[in-house]
Amino acid sequence: MTSYFSLTMLGLILPGTAVAYQVIPRRARWAVLLAASYVTFWAISGKLLAFLLASTVTIWLCGLALDREIKQRGEALRAPGANRKAVKQSYARRMRLIMAAGAVVNLGMLFAFKYVVFAHRLLAPLAAPLLTHLGIGWAAPAAIAAPIGISFYTLQAVSYLVDVYRQSVTADRNLCRLALFMAFFPQIMEGPICRYGQTAQALWAGHGITWENLVSGSQRILWGAAKKLIVADRVNLLVKTVFASYESYDGGIIALAAVLYTIQLYCDFSGTMDFVVGTGRIFGVRLPENFRQPFFSRTASEFWQRWHITLGTWFRDYVFYPVSLSKPVKRLTTSARHLLGNRMGPVAASGVALLAVWLGNGLWHGAGGQYVLFGLFWFTIIWLGGFAEPIAQSIYERLGIDRSALPYRAFQHARTLVVVFCGELIFRADGGWAALGMLRRLFGQFSLASFADGTMLKLGMDGADFACVGIAIAVLFVVGLLRERAQHDPAASATPAGHAGMPAAATANTAATRFALAWWQNFNVRWVLGCALILAIVVFGAYGAGYVPVDPMYASF
């Protein structure tokens, strides 16, 4: 079982867990969720469950050690005649060591599973001559299967340790509660990357399954299944064909593959997040959203505030801010202000933290040259965008261009989409050199001839497939537009989200927004839409004869 939309998950694990959860006493419901989580993990990764357990026990022990140091520091500071500065420095040093030890253990396991082979490939040309001269043998390490979700739960583990160190949360003395936070079965494969303060208490609370949560959660799961099975899995064969032999195609086909891969990745990943959030809703747990209409973005920075949101905020809070506030970068910022001024200086200095974020982001996804290029690509786009913004603003003001006008906003959307498609092409390529080769053909040999001669219909998708995907994308656009307008309504956006992440209709200011939200949230309409989704999945889903099941794409990261 490697898919959330498999019969094993939808027909056995999820309903079985829900029934067992509801019938036993509230105080023991956490045990049902934890058992389901470990059974799911075992079904996918078998004995590698031991590494998840090791990670959990490590942060539990380190958290308790940090908690002890925090309490002892408080007692030492309250002691008569205490040298407060010396006490703070002493305990801060010890607490940093404890936090670092826990982080190193967890990141070390991640490195061992994901990056040893890549590191060997990079270092071998440099180290091999020296080792040969010294008579030391160095065998190439073999690639090994990693525990499912290790990239996700490792970041959760590190965030817990840092938050305890910062005293944002109190160390949990209950190992089982911490284990459930680390392993909750809907999010174990693909996230979202949660903070302890967001979900731990809700998972432990054992809220009963209500009819409203069951219906809204199930409909969210259906919506995710439709995105994955109707769109993502349908375009998979064309994407695989073109990326595997890009030398055989002109720039037009490569552009088509890049666009379809971006759509595939979004529908697969956001569809999986719909399952995860919907399942959490059934059990009364509000998991953080990972997507917020990313293709409505007008800049590259905005795109990454809407795409894989929990990963972006993790790197912001645990990499960007610490690096930016470090003493060397502060000194660099001061020097940059003197050289470049108060506007450009901080932008230039922020490049250090931004580079750390984007190299980390790229390598978090995988060990390969394409992931390094992916990170460098987005670093360059966003960093240079920071330099260009004040210059562009000055030019537009002199030319009298209204940046809030529809034509300019449309230009921004189109420009951002082109950047996104290029970035995802790099991301999907089979290696760094392949990414560069595809970009070279995309821009150097662009042609629409393959669309006219029928080549595009011989790559795994026929006319009916393209029509099906086109209609599905149109539906996604309309739903996204509805959500976008709802979230930009000042009154509606100020209220808690209702069904499917939308605010209550009664809070909207405009008549159009009120009508759209009321229609969306009408009970009968939701049931009709739910039945329509089931019918659409049955009729148009890419499964059965002629289709190869596609594992969740982000599960491999």
Residue ranges of predicted features:
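Membrane-embedded transmembrane alpha-helical bundles that form the catalytic cores
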Residues: 1-556
